[in-house]
C-alpha cells in the first residue's frame, strides 16, 4: 500500500493535481477494493500489466487537469463499470455530487459496496439504463466507456444543463468519431457546439494512446 501511495502522490504532484493525504489513502484503498472485486465481477481488464493505481485511478484523476469540479456541482458518470472515473474524482472533490449509473446490476452492487467501505457521502451508485433517467439534469457528464461519441452526445444532450459539458476518456484515433458527432448537430437539436480532444500522452507518455474528449454545449 505504501508503494502505491508514494507512486500516486508523486504522479499527482508531477502533474499539478492537488490531493490531500486523506484522499491519497482513500484512492489507494479504492484501488485495492477494485482489484478484489474484479476477481468476482468483471469490472476492468484482468490482462493489463500496469498497476490499477496508475492504469485506472490516476487515469481518472487526469480529468481534473482540464475541468475544475466545484462545490455543489452535479456530475453523472455514465456507464461507470467499477466506479471509473466517478469514484476517484468523488474522493478528490468531496464537495461535488456524483451519480454513478450502469445497466449491469453486479457492477453497481460492487460500486455500492466500495462506496460504503470508503465512507463516501457525495456519491451514489444507481442500477439503471441511461434511457430510464428522467427528471434529472447535471452540470457535467463523464464517461470512460467505449460507446461511440455520437451516442454519448445523444444521451448527454437531454441530461445536461445549459452550458454543460461531456468529458470522455477514450483511446485510439478519434478524428472520424468526433467528425461524426459534430456533423450530427444538423440532425439532432441540442448537440454540442464544440468538440475538442486532448491527447493524454502530452501529459504523460504512459497514456500515449489515450485521449480526453470534451464536448461543450
UniProtKB/Swiss-Prot annotation:
Its main location: cytoplasm. Keywords: Cytoplasm, Methyltransferase, rRNA processing, S-adenosyl-L-methionine, Transferase. One of its GO terms (molecular function) is rRNA (guanine-N7-)-methyltransferase activity. It holds the Pfam family GidB. S-adenosyl-L-methionine binds at residues 79, 84, 102-104, 130-131, 144. Its EC number is 2.1.1.-. This is Ribosomal RNA small subunit methyltransferase G. It comes from Chlorobaculum tepidum (strain ATCC 49652 / DSM 12025 / NBRC 103806 / TLS) (Chlorobium tepidum). The lineage of its organism: Bacteria, Pseudomonadati, Chlorobiota, Chlorobiia, Chlorobiales. The gene is rsmG.
Amino acid at each position: 500500500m505504501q508503494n502505491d501511495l508514494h507512486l500516486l502522490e508523486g504522479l499527482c504532484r508531477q502533474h499539478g493535481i492537488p490531493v490531500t493525504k486523506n484522499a491519497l489513502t482513500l484512492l489507494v484503498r479504492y484501488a485495492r477494493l477494485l482489484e478484489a472485486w474484479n476477481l468476482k465481477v468483471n469490472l476492468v481488464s484482468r490482462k493489463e500489466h500496469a498497476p490499477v493505481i496508475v492504469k485506472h485511478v490516476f487515469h481518472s484523476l487526469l480529468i481534473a487537469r482540464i475541468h475544475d469540479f466545484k462545490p455543489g456541482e452535479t456530475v453523472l458518470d455514465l456507464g461507470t463499470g467499477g466506479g471509473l472515473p466517478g469514484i476517484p474524482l468523488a474522493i478528490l472533490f468531496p464537495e461535488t455530487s456524483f451519480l454513478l449509473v450502469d445497466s449491469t446490476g453486479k457492477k453497481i452492487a460492487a460500486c455500492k459496496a466500495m462506496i460504503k467501505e470508503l465512507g463516501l457521502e457525495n456519491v451514489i451508485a444507481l442500477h439503471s439504463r441511461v434511457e430510464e433517467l428522467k427528471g434529472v439534469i447535471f452540470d457535467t457528464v463523464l464517461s470512460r466507456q467505449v460507446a461511440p461519441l455520437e451516442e454519448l452526445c445523444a444521451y448527454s444532450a437531454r441530461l445536461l444543463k445549459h452550458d454543460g459539458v461531456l468529458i470522455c476518456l477514450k483511446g485510439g484515433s478519434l478524428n472520424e468519431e468526433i467528425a461524426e458527432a459534430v456533423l450530427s448537430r444538423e440532425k439532432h437539436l441540442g448537440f454540442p457546439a464544440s468538440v475538442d480532444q486532448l491527447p493524454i500522452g502530452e501529459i504523460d507518455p504512459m497514456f500515449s494512446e489515450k485521449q480526453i474528449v470534451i464536448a461543450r454545449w
